[in-house]
Amino acid sequence: WKRYNVNTVRTCHYPQQERFYELCDEYGIYVIDEANIESHGMGYDLRVGGTLGNNPLFMNAHLDRTMNMYERDKNHPSVIIWSLGNEAGNGLNFYVTYNTLKTLDSRPIQYERALLEWNTDIYCPMYASPSYLEKYARNKEMTRPLILCEYAHAMGNSLGNFQDYWDIIEKYPILQGGCIWDWVDQGFAAKTDDDRKYWTYGGDYGENGTPSDGNFCINGVVYPDRSVKPQTEEMGKVYQNIKFLDFDKQTSTVKIRNDFSFTNLDKYDFYYIIRDHGKEVYRGKIENIHAAPGKTVTTGFLNGIPKEKQTTGDVRIEFYAAIKTAEPFLPAGTVIAREQTYVHTFY
């Protein structure tokens, strides 16, 4: 997660084992802790006897599962938000679980099926479009932060327009991000007749017509063995908290914006690479970058390219930010932000 700029996990759709929270405490991952309540098969009909969320017969079950989560996990600093459950309708039982948690704890509570009702502190829709997010953000009557509890369903090329989401999210403070559905592909390793490895899914087992979910289980941003996919790289790039902006070829300057909340940019090494038709022709350091959270600095970065390295071909310049000192899971030199700009001719 850290390597690819992920800072939050939602424990959909039930609490995780205790060791998970200890690791999140240690490594600095925000947790949206979700109660073990998921009953969308019963529908969302608010009439009594419809959705279980509004059925008094199930009130104790809702309370029990919510309180089990709270009592076990309440002392973990990584838990910053409580989630009442997932796709289980709304109604009396969730009004009660919300009020009960509020009497015990000051942390925010979210619940997707509450939509814009009162029993959620965060508006947390699923799979809202970028245009919908902007419409919400521009509506002055909307005061609750919006966090997409699920978005960018990572099947196929789902993350192909991921930047479109974050262009909007970063534009409006009321938009606070989201949780990609989901993290890891669920598949088994197998080999072809010529001994090449591949990942299987529904339809690869049993006779034709055997019930399965097809490829609906291959929807993560990493492979089943946790190796990276193209989507992983796209996610890490879009999520990066260091932005390289407004490169000026004439003055050899670039703006560097710090989107971190707590970290100064002096903990990173900055450098650039110039490529001609993909081949590296020059690299250099960008020295003495200091920018507090939320601040932007403009810096010069070229002391002149040696004459024999000058080029007039298909030229691109790449900027990088890398960790100076090793951190847990992140060796020194790990690149956590990058940008590429088309230059064409350079000097």
Predicted regions mapped to residue ranges:
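Extended substrate-binding grooves/exosites of carbohydrate-active enzymes
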Residues: 1-255, 259-266, 271-283
